[in-house]
């Protein structure tokens, strides 16, 4: 099968080059709100985010970051065709702000947006993604109730646009030639990824 690829190196806030309802599949992974490495990026999009972080208003910053992400999700919803699929890799964040440690559930906010905009959830994937270096817990982190569950998973959220599935020609040759073997189907469609390792991520910020 011959494929053609076109790359747009630009912000996804405005995908004006792509017609509405023209994309069958979107696979993406955004910056994760409340992960410190992305604070500067989110703050550049909305000055209120920087202020909220400086004032230790974690919940406010979290909600404002997702308001920015929602602009991208709105564009994704626009270009996705009815029955099309969007897959989003996103992890939750844990963070201590002004002596309060808590979880920021990014996957909940993303799911909330797509449900509000008429997409439906399909079974998602839990990506068991241990950190690349062993973590040492010392001091109060070894004592109840200060010891907390280690966050070592991310989500692959899967949504369909609308309740109707895409329609195909009966006995479509291309479709049936793409059928999975039984062993492949069981492995590739597992709802837990255990053997796919993540890689360290760095920002190349020029000062």
Regions found by a protein language model. Name each.
Residues 1-207:
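Core catalytic lobe of class I
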């Amino acid at each position: 099968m011959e494929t053609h690829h076109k790359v747009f190196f630009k912000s996804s806030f405005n995908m004006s080059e792509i017609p509405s309802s023209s994309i069958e599949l979107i696979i993406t992974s955004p910056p994760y709100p409340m992960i410190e490495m992305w604070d500067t990026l989110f703050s550049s999009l909305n000055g209120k985010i920087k202020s909220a972080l400086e004032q230790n208003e974690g919940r406010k910053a979290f909600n404002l970051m997702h308001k920015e992400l929602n602009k991208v999700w709105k564009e994704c919803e626009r270009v996705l065709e009815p029955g099309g699929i969007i897959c989003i890799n996103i992890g939750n964040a844990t963070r201590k702000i002004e002596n309060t440690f808590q979880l920021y559930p990014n996957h909940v906010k993303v799911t909330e947006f797509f449900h509000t905009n008429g997409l439906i959830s399909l079974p998602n994937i839990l990506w068991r993604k241990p950190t690349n270096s062993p973590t040492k817990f010392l001091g109060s982190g070894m004592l109840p109730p200060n010891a907390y569950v280690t966050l070592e998973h991310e989500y692959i959220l899967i949504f369909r646009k609308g309740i109707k599935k895409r329609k195909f020609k009966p006995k479509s040759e291309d479709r049936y030639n793409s059928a999975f073997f039984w062993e492949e189907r069981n492995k590739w469609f597992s709802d837990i990824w255990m053997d796919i390792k993540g890689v360290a991520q760095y920002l190349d910020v020029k000062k």
